[in-house]
């Protein structure tokens, strides 16, 4: 069965790349910063949940509360399911609404086992994932301000995390290694054509400056060209 979360996940991942590139091109407004964090968090969460689904790991979700016999049967069917992608794909919207999915902080706790051999020995992405969670919580649930949300250092960390996470997407293997539909990326090697929007084989940033990004932006260069032509 085709992974059920990936269409949504790829939309979010492609959006995160666009907003990341926009910020690097000097569009450092709060709107772009919020959308970058939101899209990246959404993509990472969905992809990690998809990994759990592809490995038929039932920790991915739970029935909220068993209220009647139908709910009890749904719970039993869930734990008996051997193809979680197919199980969730065939549920009605009403039954889907009865599930709570795993929380992001729990995904952080599981990430080393979940990513498996895609991580180097002793490697951890806990710091980066916790930063992403903190920024997402702040922009969703509490006060943020232009100039203080997503610092230059934080943007640098998340940019470089995206490079590492994309490598994980490239190399991650499901338990059933022979089922190629269960791999995360729908292509091998460098993406081409329509898939090119998902690639993130970039060079890591050693530092980042919003001011420098604005000065070096396409718009600033265009204005400079117009002024110099007079």
Functional labels for PLM-detected ranges:
Residues 18-24, 110-118, 140-142:
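Short, charged/polar, low-complexity loop and linker segments
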Residues 1-42, 47-55, 189, 205-213, ...:
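Charged alpha-helical initiation segments
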Residues 8, 15, 39-42, 128-138, ...:
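Charged, amphipathic alpha-helical oligomerization/scaffolding segments
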Residues 127, 131, 144-230:
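Polyanionic, low-complexity intrinsically disordered segments
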Residues 60-130, 134-135, 145-146:
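Flexible secondary-structure boundary motifs
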Residues 4, 31, 35, 124-127, ...:
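A structural signal for alpha-helical segments
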Residues 28, 55-65, 180-184:
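Short, glycine/acidic-rich hinge or "gate" loops at secondary-structure transitions
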Residues 18-21, 48-53, 137-145, 167-178:
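Charged/polar positions within long, soluble alpha-helices
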């Amino acid at each position: 069965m085709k992974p059920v979360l990936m269409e949504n996940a790829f939309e979010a991942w492609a959006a995160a790349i666009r907003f990341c590139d926009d910020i690097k091109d000097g569009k450092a407004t709060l709107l772009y910063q919020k959308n970058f964090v939101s899209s990246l968090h959404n993509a990472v969460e969905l992809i990690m949940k998809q990994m759990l689904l592809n490995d038929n790991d039932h920790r991915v979700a739970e029935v909220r509360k068993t209220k009647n016999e139908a709910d009890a049967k749904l719970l039993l069917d869930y734990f008996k399911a051997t193809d979680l992608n197919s199980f969730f794909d065939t549920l009605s919207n009403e039954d889907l609404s009865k599930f709570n999915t795993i929380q992001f902080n729990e995904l952080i706790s599981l990430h080393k086992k979940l990513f498996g051999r895609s991580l180097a020995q002793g490697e951890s992405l806990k710091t980066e994932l916790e930063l992403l969670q903190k920024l997402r919580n702040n922009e969703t649930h509490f006060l943020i301000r232009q100039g203080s949300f997503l610092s230059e250092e934080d943007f640098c960390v998340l940019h470089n995390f995206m490079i590492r996470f994309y490598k994980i997407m490239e190399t991650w293997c499901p338990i059933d290694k022979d089922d190629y539909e269960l791999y995360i990326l729908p292509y091998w090697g460098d993406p081409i054509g329509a898939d090119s929007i998902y690639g993130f084989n970039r060079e890591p940033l050693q530092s980042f400056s919003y001011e420098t990004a604005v000065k070096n932006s396409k718009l600033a260069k265009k204005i400079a060209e117009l002024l110099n032509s007079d």
